[in-house]
C-alpha cells in the first residue's frame, strides 16, 4: 500500500485492504516529517512509522479485524496538524 503524507492530508492507495494477510505500507512525505499512526476500529494504535521526505519507510501489519481503520499524524507538522486524518477499510474476502 502506497502512503504519502503532506500538510495536512494523507494519500492512500488502495483504500480497501484484505483481512488475515500481511500488508506492507510504503510510507513517505511530500513536505515535512509526519508521524504515520494506524488505529484499529476500537481506536487503539496498532502500528507507527515516520513519514519523511526523500525516504520510504516500510510498516508491515496483519489485520485480523474487519472494519474502518484510521490513520493519524502523531508528529506536530503545522497549524492544521489535528485535521490530518484518513481512513481505509479492511474486508474479509473469506466470507
Language-model regions: role of each:
Residues 51-95:
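Extracellular/periplasmic metallocenter environments
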Residues 8, 41-43, 76:
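Residue-level signature for short turns and capping positions that connect secondary-structure elements
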Residues 1-7, 11-36, 57-65:
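Beta-strand cores of secreted/periplasmic/IMS beta-sandwich domains, seen most often
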Residues 18-19, 40-43, 68-72:
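Short amphipathic alpha-helical surface micro-motifs
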Residues 13, 35-37, 46, 69-71, ...:
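Short acidic, gly/pro-rich beta-turn/loop elements at beta-sheet edges
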Residues 3, 28, 32-52, 86:
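Histidine- and aromatic-enriched segments that form or immediately flank copper-ligand environments
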